[in-house]
Each structure stands twice: as structure tokens, then as C-alpha cells.
Amino acid sequence: MISDFNVDPTAFYNIYKTRDTPENIKSLLCEGNESGEGVMQCFEIAPGIQITYNDLNMDSCFRPLRFEKNFLQINHCLEGCYECELEGGAVSFLGEGDLCVDYLSKDKQVFLGSRIPLKKYRGITVLLEMETAQKTLDNGFQQANINLEQIKDRLCSDGRSLIIKSKHEIDHIFSELYSVDERIQIPYFWIKVIELLLFLSLLDGSSVRHPQQFSADISKRTQEVYQYIIENPFMKETIPDLACMFGVAESSLKR
């Protein structure tokens, strides 16, 4: 129930303003613009560790941001897709069932922009403030021997995002997070965060890849195709037809 949350109408980027001692177990962040609105339900699991449920029905909620601390951010997409603009003008996508691991450094602007092409994105973000979260893990679950720096160095060694395509272990972890009983949410979240980090600690190269990147021109043409489909729902054109109409390769549209 929304009434159970402390409503904060400010920007979504409040999730990056971490505290050593969480003040609110749950909070609700609401934001809107001319393209739509979105809601984030945030749960502070422990110092430096947060889970956010994202329900965004808008074409963008991006604002440039310099982080005050270093974060490991893990995003899982349940529905829709999310597009990020990277340095050099390339664009990458997070699609349904994918898991994305990002290292957000206070010394570097990682993302130059973002869009929600379908104006629909539902998913979960696990956010760990590196220093504080490591202390929490060492004190609360030392037997797991989880090292966030090692996870970051192995999965995001060159500063880029990492995409892990949908697989059984990911589906198992997150399917239960989307349906957990409210009465046991916080302790259950803690268990699932540990499970997720242990899973990431064991990943090898066969399960991971860097996000597919597209040039700004291909991204723009693909968006024009999408808009054409939305405006002409009963169209008869095939993918080859659309590729020819908009001057983009069939392989790019299929991806």
C-alpha cells in the first residue's frame, strides 16, 4: 500500500544518497514529466545495501549526475527495455530477463543519457555503496567471503557495463523477489542479496558479455521504425520492408 511508504516527490537519484545508518526501511520516490510518470519503491536492507522496485511509464527520467561515492549497481529487467547512451555516442540496451552489472564511479560520468523506448520498464535494482556495503557484508555474513572489489574488477574491469543473459539461476533469484510476501520482505531481501552476490562471485566468461552497442544513427532509425509501428498497428510490412524504408540493416532491427 502506498500509504505505508514515506512519499518523496523529488528526483529518482535520491537512491544514491546513502547513509551509514538507514533512516527509513521503505520509501517511495515518484517522478513525472510530459512523457509520463514512474514510481520507485526503495527498501534499505542494511547500511550500504538497497533494493528498488522500478515501475516506469515514461520515455526518460535521465539527469546527469556525479556520484559522491562508488557504487556497484545490479539491474534486472522484468518487462520492457532500457536504453543507455555511452561515451562516443554508442547506445546499449537492457532487455527482458537480462541482468546488468555497472560500476558507478565518483570519478567518472558513466552514462551520457538514457531512454525507455517502449515507455515501459519494470525491474529491480540492487544498489551497493562499495565501502559501506563491504563492511556490512564482513560484519553480517563473513562466512560468505564476498569481496565487492573482486566482483567489480572481474565483471566491470574496463569500466563498462556487463550484461548477463537470462538463465536459470537469475530467473530463480529474481522471480521470488517479485513475489515475496510483505511480512518477510526485509530479511528475505537480505538472503537474496547474499545469494545474488555469491552467484556473481562464481560467474565465468561463458555466461557474460558486454552490452550490444549501436551507433547513434542506428539507434535513431530504429526508434523511427518503432514509432511507425505504433502509429500503424495494422501494417503489413515485414522486417525487410521496414529495413529498406528506414535505411537500416535487418540485423539491427532484429536485435
Tell where the protein language model's regions lie, with residue ranges.
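Catalytic micro-motifs at enzyme active sites that drive phosphoryl/nucleotidyl and oxygen chemistry
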Residues: 40-41, 61-65, 88-89, 110-116
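Glycine- and acidic-residue-biased ligand/ion/polar-headgroup-sensing regions
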Residues: 68-90, 97-99, 129-130
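Short helix/strand-capping hinge loops at secondary-structure junctions
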Residues: 232-236
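N-terminal low-complexity or simple alpha-helical regulatory segments
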Residues: 1-69
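Alpha-helical bundle regulatory/interaction domains
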Residues: 85, 94-215, 239-240, 244-250
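Short hydrophobic beta-strand segments that form the core of ligand-binding sensory/regulatory domains
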Residues: 53-55, 73-75, 122-129
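Short, leucine-enriched amphipathic alpha-helices that occur as contiguous helical runs
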Residues: 218-226
